[in-house]
Swiss-Prot record:
The gene is haus8. It is found in: Cytoplasm; Cytoplasm, Cytoskeleton, Microtubule organizing center, Centrosome; Cytoplasm, Cytoskeleton, Spindle; Cytoplasm, Cytoskeleton, Spindle pole. Residues 1-35, 54-81 are annotated as: Disordered. Keywords: Cell cycle, Cell division, Coiled coil, Cytoplasm, Cytoskeleton, Microtubule, Mitosis. It comes from Xenopus laevis (African clawed frog). Residues 183-221 form a coiled coil. Its main location: cytoplasm. Component of the HAUS augmin-like complex. The complex interacts with the gamma-tubulin ring complex and this interaction is required for spindle assembly. Associates with microtubules. The interaction with microtubules is strong during mitosis, while it is weak or absent during interphase. It is unclear whether this interaction is direct or indirect. Belongs to the HAUS8 family. One of its GO terms (cellular component) is mitotic spindle microtubule. This is HAUS augmin-like complex subunit 8. Contributes to mitotic spindle assembly, maintenance of centrosome integrity and completion of cytokinesis as part of the HAUS augmin-like complex. One of its GO terms (biological process) is cell division. The keyword Kinase does not apply.
């Protein structure tokens, strides 16, 4: 690779040297100015030494000797590496627009304007340079995938027909299963709705029965309590009548003794209780006498009572009629007096003068 990369560089260097010598001769003939030869033209003389030095730097893993020591290669020792890169540079890279001001005019000619070499400086950092192995060029024919030339085992037609029939049967069965499943789902939904309705009805009946049961239990408890009260109060019923009589006598005695009588102007001899006892005896005597007198005159008193009642009704009616007639008489007298006063006023106004009438009805200050 190194020899192949150096060979074209050498030819180009010779051509460039020839061209540069011709230019120098023209310049001498024109003006006689001093021409400095380029060091780049000396690459052909030290071909063998440079190749051997490049091989040693690439293959060996040792350090590069320091600059200034004996036998160290100078900047020109990198020419083989530059030659390798320039061999693969395309034609558009030879344009002069890619160079910068840092490029020396003495080292480059018009025919050798190329891009800067990509220098590998791993040797300076004690690293071995690995030789880049070229990759084989892959053509378009090689990129095409290779077809499998193995023979394909063909399936017999009977097997294909059998598989098709089985697939048809399976599809039919799946469709039928789906239809049956859909029908069963609808039936299950209807059954669930019916079950829910029945559940609601049963819950309502259960609530009604629970309420009736609680009412019955409460009635039974009340009945038991009433029976127990009857059992306890039955002996009291026999003593109810004497208790009632005793209670009435006690109430009357309490009423008579609770309120004090107005005895302010009554002379009482002795104790008050003794006076009440004597008074009670006298009242009992008067009661017996009245009972003896009343039966003989009861019929007469009833007849007289009826007549007195009728007379009372007649008196009430006459009283009402008299009150009504009296009101009517008062209204009539009021109207008569009013009419008489109006007539007398009219007669007086007619007989008297207007000035006098004006004084009667109006203030004297008015004109």
């Amino acid at each position: 690779m190194s020899e192949a990369g150096v060979a074209p560089i050498e030819d180009g260097s010779q051509n460039s040297s020839g061209g540069s010598s011709g230019d120098a001769a023209l310049k001498k003939s024109k003006g006689g100015a001093k021409v400095v030869k380029s060091r780049y033209m000396q690459i052909g003389r030290s071909k063998v030494s440079k190749n051997s030095l490049a091989n040693t730097t690439v293959c060996s893993g040792g350090k590069v000797p320091e600059r200034g020591s004996g036998g160290t290669p100078t900047r020109r020792s990198l020419a083989p590496h530059k030659a390798k890169i320039t061999a693969a540079v395309p034609l558009p890279a030879l344009d002069g627009s890619i160079f910068t001001k840092e490029d020396l005019q003495s080292t480059l000619l018009d025919g050798h304007r190329i891009a800067r070499p990509d220098l590998d400086l791993s040797v300076i950092n004690d690293r071995t340079l690995q030789k880049i192995t070229p990759r084989p060029v892959v053509t378009s024919e090689q990129k095409k995938p290779k077809r499998d030339t193995t023979p394909v085992n063909l399936v017999p037609e009977d097997m294909v027909e059998m598989i098709e029939s089985q697939t048809l049967l399976l599809t039919y069965l799946t469709i039928k299963m789906q239809k049956n499943l859909f029908r069963l789902e609808e039936k299950a939904e209807r059954n669930l709705l019916l079950v829910n309705d029945q559940k609601d009805q049963l819950q309502e009946t259960i609530h009604m029965m629970k309420r009736d049961l609680t009412l019955l239990q409460r009635e039974e408890r009340l009945r038991d309590l009433i029976e127990k009260q009857d059992e306890v109060l039955t002996p009291v019923v026999t003593s109810k009548d004497p208790f009632k009589d005793n209670y009435t006598t006690f109430a009357t005695a309490l009423d008579s003794t609770r309120h004090q009588l107005a005895i302010k102007n009554i002379h009482i001899t002795g104790n008050r209780h003794r006076y009440l006892e004597e008074l009670q005896k006298h009242l009992a005597i008067t009661k017996s006498l009245l009972e003896e007198i009343m039966p003989s005159h009861a019929s007469e008193n009833a007849e007289s009572f009826d007549t007195i009642k009728d007379l009372e009704n007649i008196v009430l009616k006459t009283d009402e009629e008299l009150a009504r007639s009296f009101r009517q008489i008062l209204d009539l007298s009021f109207k008569v007096n009013k009419e008489i006063s109006l007539q007398s006023q009219k007669a007086v106004e007619e007989t008297c003068e207007s000035a006098l009438v004006r004084q009667w009805y109006f203030d004297g200050s008015l004109p």
